[in-house]
Amino acid sequence: MKRRDFLKTSAVAGAALSLNFDGLQAALSSNTVAVEKAPDLVAVMGGEPAAMLDKALEALGGIGKFVKKGQKVVIKPNIGWDRAPEMAGNTNPELVAALVKKCLGAGAQKVTVFDHTCDNWQKCYETSGISDAVKKAGGIMMPGNDEKYYKEVAIPGGVTLKNAKIHESLIEADVWINVPVLKNHGGAKLTCAMKNYMGIVWDRRYFHSNDLQQCIADICTWNKKPVLNIVDAYRIMHKNGPQGKSLSDVAQLKTLIASTNIVATDTAALRFFNQVEKLDISAVGHIGKGEALKLGTSNLDKLTIKRIKI
């Protein structure tokens, strides 16, 4: 890394970190209480990926609440780009590996990980660090680069999207967990839990040609919902996404957000993103469209939120 880029990155990360704990606390202050029952949404700040995952799952009731013994589990991270972890173009490999171990520890029959990548799939899997991390954790990497891996399903709840070819591993799985990285996106404006669904389908060109924001919301109505959404915001690409141009596009914020409510997940993540780079919720149209389709709520005042600082 060039010294100039390093200094720029350090400055950005430092500024963002100063906003993180105070800013996120304010952004997610509604109905934030110490609760005995599982909260609707958890935000963990200040730790390493595995430690933050531990805290989030503990607050939500444990991994056993989401994964049962003997189940086939799919973990769907973002692995779309031939980028190293430091660029925050993909989900943090440490988080993915930790989640694989959690699922296997809960008695999962097998844990499969895949993405329909944008760059060459083998390079994405390798450079992201996810393939190596998953295999070492005991999981299975599945390709997503060929149409033969996808099966057509109906999307009866969709407004624009009425059917789609979805990866067979998801169709065959008992449960799946949605694990996006939080980042800027030129087209969708924000990549998070809802946008991460685009990596489960074969024909993404249809999305881009037929109201991208609506199609993102539509695909999320597919009847097999993730049992949990876990947002990786350990590092975030706050500009020039989805690939990024340099490390100056990245801020290290050491945060994780988890919820079963996908619209609330993206709303909370957007509020967090706004502590670094301003983006109005109206620009991220799929959030409002998802709420209109009754996928969840963007009104965080209605939810119980637990914040944890490590």
What do the predicted segments below correspond to?
Residues M1-I310:
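N-terminal and secondary-structure boundary signal
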